[in-house]
Amino acid sequence: MLTKLLKISCTSRQCTFAKPYQAIPGPRGPFGMGNLYNYLPGIGSYSWLRLHQAGQDKYEKYGAIVRETIVPGQDIVWLYDPKDIALLLNERDCPQRRSHLALAQYRKSRPDVYKTTGLLPTNGPEWWRIRAQVQKELSAPKSVRNFVRQVDGVTKEFIRFLQESRNGGAIDMLPKLTRLNLELTCLLTFGARLQSFTAQEQDPRSRSTRLMDAAETTNSCILPTDQGLQLWRFLETPSFRKLSQAQSYMESVALELVEENVRNGSVGSSLISAYVKNPELDRSDVVGTAADLLLAGIDTTSYASAFLLYHIARNPEVQQKLHEEARRVLPSAKDELSMDALRTDITYTRAVLKESLRLNPIAVGVGRILNQDAIFSGYFVPKGTTVVTQNMVACRLEQHFQDPLRFQPDRWLQHRSALNPYLVLPFGHGMRACIARRLAEQNMHILLLRLLREYELIWSGSDDEMGVKTLLINKPDAPVLIDLRLRRE
């Protein structure tokens, strides 16, 4: 109700009494020429690779709403207050965002492959046309549960792969988790196994390794090409060249796997088999969606899983509770994991994942382009403005969470009703929330149950807190070194 009243207020005479947009505090750069210089290596105090630190600094200097001029004519309004975040994300129209601009340009240059720029960059009715069709197979709880057996089978294979990788010492988990999520993404999307755990596929020239590299390269190029002067619109900059080369390879694999699926008569329960049969989607829609799922499905869940295992390994009491829950769900490690158990019997596992995503979300926040004028923290913000939430910073503030830097899953079991629902939004919110959220969560739940059922996780990395690199999505900035010790029954 409050959100509705706030929205109405901006279209009424009350909007007149809001403080002007120009009065929002924040960095404008020397002579109003923009703050881009402050992100340049060796010159500025900020970094595109440390956006969370820049966000914390701006909050401390300017408060809960910040207007930053990147270059003249290109502003970002940053929001830290959950009331403002709720107002932004409870949209009535098709949500718009300003992201993946260079990816959109690459796809526009390939009209023989793509009819649209895909789910990630596209806005408006065309975005909704695609989203409405592809989300049926990805968002419905029943559809997601249909993948449990496949995911569980690959996860058990992954744990055997970890056993073979131990060699008596700690394992850097992130590269291993990336292979797991690549394998799961290709299996669920295309119904295809890449055999990513084999020695052959661990070769740097293999398809698996090249796909992993291409996904990370693409994601690392998004922020630098989205912001600033965008010279790539006029000439081939190094970042645009890297993105294009990476996307060209991912596109070739997506085309190959889609065609293979079609040749096989679209058999099985893969996502692409359903999309190929959908009369509302043509071949270019299917290929674009396949490329999007490859790009979005590999690194996001891998990085989130790496932070998750890091927190568990550093918190033995949490780990013991997880092990006990895993034993209740899987009395024997050889038992099948049931869909009913995942739905009703893993309360603590869910809390652990949520707490990890509070401290280390997939991204620093959620971006939107305003569809209408709005008021945030008493300031007028006009339609068309780029607004980005700062959930990662907000989730580490004492006014929102008691002892905010402590990893404490029990907070989600004991005081959940008192916690603002617009603070922890790792998958976004509303119509434009992550289309594969339920599937990603289910995959991570299965990984936790299987791994903690058999192994104790011992942290072998630095005693310092794990840092973050913001490659569009948040990545651990150091090896996630964990020693796996087989539990005795």
Swiss-Prot record:
GO terms for molecular function: ecdysteroid 22-hydroxylase activity; heme binding; iron ion binding. Pathway: Steroid biosynthesis; ecdysteroid biosynthesis. It catalyses: 2,22-dideoxyecdysone + 2 reduced [adrenodoxin] + O2 + 2 H(+) = 2-deoxyecdysone + 2 oxidized [adrenodoxin] + H2O. Its cofactor is heme. Its main location: mitochondrion. The keyword Heme applies. Heme binds at C434. InterPro entries: CYP11_CYP27_families (IPR050479), Cyt_P450 (IPR001128), Cyt_P450_CS (IPR017972), Cyt_P450_E_grp-I (IPR002401), Cyt_P450_sf (IPR036396). Complex coexpression pattern of dib (disembodied) and sad (shade) in the early embryo that restricts to the prothoracic gland cells of the developing ring gland during late embryogenesis. In larvae and adult, coexpression is seen in prothoracic gland and follicle cells of the ovary. In adults, coexpression is seen in the follicle cells. GO terms for cellular component: mitochondrial membrane; mitochondrion. Keywords: Heme, Iron, Membrane, Metal-binding, Mitochondrion, Monooxygenase, Oxidoreductase, Transit peptide. It comes from the Eukaryota. Its EC number is 1.14.15.44. It is an enzyme of class 1 (oxidoreductase). PROSITE patterns: CYTOCHROME_P450. The keyword Transit peptide applies. It is found in: Mitochondrion membrane. GO terms for biological process: central nervous system development; chitin-based embryonic cuticle biosynthetic process; dorsal closure; ecdysone biosynthetic process; head involution; midgut development. Required for CNS development; negatively regulates glial cell division in the embryonic midline. Involved in the metabolism of insect hormones; responsible for ecdysteroid C22-hydroxylase activity. May be involved in the breakdown of synthetic insecticides. Belongs to the cytochrome P450 family. Member of the Halloween gene group. This is Cytochrome P450 302a1, mitochondrial. The gene is dib.
